[in-house]
């Protein structure tokens, strides 16, 4: 699997509700490792730590699917978190009716992966998802 696709999969697994995800880590000797250490200590990478932090913060929060198509997936966790995944090669915008899907207004949602922020301030808010990336916003 492409490493970027793997990161998008981790964002989905650690962003959604339910369960206790298991993170695969591989410490094979160099002679046996066909992935050049890709999974060695993955649980200890800053990206994985941030995804796990999001997962733990959203524990017990409901999950509501907001939008999905061939490229993007957007869901929220209570009013405290939003996960957006874009698997295509260009930026995609997902516009949300914040009356239909409740969000906290006028406070920053901060992405744990990139430090990008989103502030909902009107009925229709567009989450712009960069190409081949995930966003895990939390209050």
Regions found by a protein language model. Give the residues of each.
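Carbohydrate-interacting/catalytic domains
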Residues: 1-139
């Amino acid at each position: 699997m492409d490493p970027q696709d793997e990161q998008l999969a981790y964002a989905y697994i650690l962003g959604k509700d339910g369960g206790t995800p298991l993170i695969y880590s591989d410490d094979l000797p160099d002679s046996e490792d066909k992935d050049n250490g890709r999974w060695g200590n993955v649980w200890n990478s800053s990206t994985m730590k941030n995804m796990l932090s999001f997962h733990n913060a959203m524990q017990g929060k409901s999950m509501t699917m907001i939008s999905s198509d061939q490229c993007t997936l957007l869901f929220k966790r209570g009013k405290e978190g939003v996960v957006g995944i874009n698997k295509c090669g260009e930026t995609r915008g997902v516009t949300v009716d914040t009356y239909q899907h409740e969000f906290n207004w006028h406070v920053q949602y901060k992405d744990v992966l990139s430090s990008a922020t989103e502030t909902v301030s009107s009925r229709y808010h567009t989450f712009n998802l960069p190409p081949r990336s995930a966003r895990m916003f939390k209050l």
